[in-house]
Swiss-Prot record:
Role of this protein: F(1)F(0) ATP synthase produces ATP from ADP in the presence of a proton or sodium gradient. F-type ATPases consist of two structural domains, F(1) containing the extramembraneous catalytic core and F(0) containing the membrane proton channel, linked together by a central stalk and a peripheral stalk. During catalysis, ATP synthesis in the catalytic domain of F(1) is coupled via a rotary mechanism of the central stalk subunits to proton translocation.
Similarity annotation: Belongs to the ATPase delta chain family.
InterPro entries tied to this protein: ATP_synth_OSCP/delta_N_sf, ATPase_OSCP/dsu
Membrane topology note: Peripheral membrane protein
NCBIfam families: ATP_synt_delta (TIGR01145), PRK05758.2-1 (NF004401)
PANTHER family, sorted: ATP SYNTHASE DELTA CHAIN
Keyword vocabulary terms for this entry: ATP synthesis, Cell membrane, CF(1), Hydrogen ion transport, Ion transport, Membrane, Transport
Protein name per its UniProtKB record: ATP synthase subunit delta
Keyword Ribonucleoprotein: no
Length: 175
């Protein structure tokens, strides 16, 4: 499925949820399903040609038992349109669209040593200001190869203040 198609499905789900005043509940269901799909590798099951449509449909029937009316209608629409293999991608796109709507993001910070809580708080404040976000989760990754400094990445926007990059720039200027 193309990203455009998954965006259409996710937009439709979010619009209906908003109309019915159930946006938070639907987003909670979407998060739970994404987690379930990852833990049980359901994306591979639904996208596999090995399993029959009826086997995949049984899985959807199981999900319908605990789903809200809006989510049930959505899952039935995806099933009737023959898009079960794309359901994982659609759910991911729904979460991304909601994060954009509410200005929520995970921000990756690569540093040469683990960040302290105080540093994480500073990066959170900086990311909120630089990337215009309301809610930030800082994910720190240690990479000793950057020598010092940090690299911040949020949705493809990168701030590279690593010592390795600065030294490479100086070397390029000298040569």
């Amino acid at each position: 499925m193309t990203k455009v198609n998954s965006q259409k499905y996710s937009k439709a789900l979010l619009e209906v949820a908003q109309e019915k005043g159930q946006l938070e509940a639907i987003l909670s269901e979407v998060s739970e399903m994404i987690q379930l799909f990852k833990e049980d590798n359901l994306v591979a099951f639904l996208s596999s040609e090995v399993y029959s449509f009826s086997a995949k449909s049984e899985l959807i029937d199981t999900l319908l038992q605990t789903s809200s009316e809006v989510m049930s209608n959505f899952l039935n629409t995806v099933r009737s349109n023959g898009r079960l293999g794309d359901l994982g991608e659609i759910l991911d796109e729904t979460k991304n669209a909601a994060d954009d709507m509410f200005k929520i993001a995970d921000v990756g910070v690569v540093s040469s040593i683990a960040l302290t809580n105080a540093q994480i708080e500073k990066f959170t404040a900086m990311a909120k200001a630089k990337f215009d976000l309301n809610e930030v989760t800082v994910i720190n990754t240690v990479n000793e190869k950057i020598l010092g400094g940090f690299i911040v990445n949020s949705r493809g926007k990168i701030i590279d203040a690593s010592l390795k990059t600065q030294l490479a720039k100086i070397a390029a200027e000298i040569l």
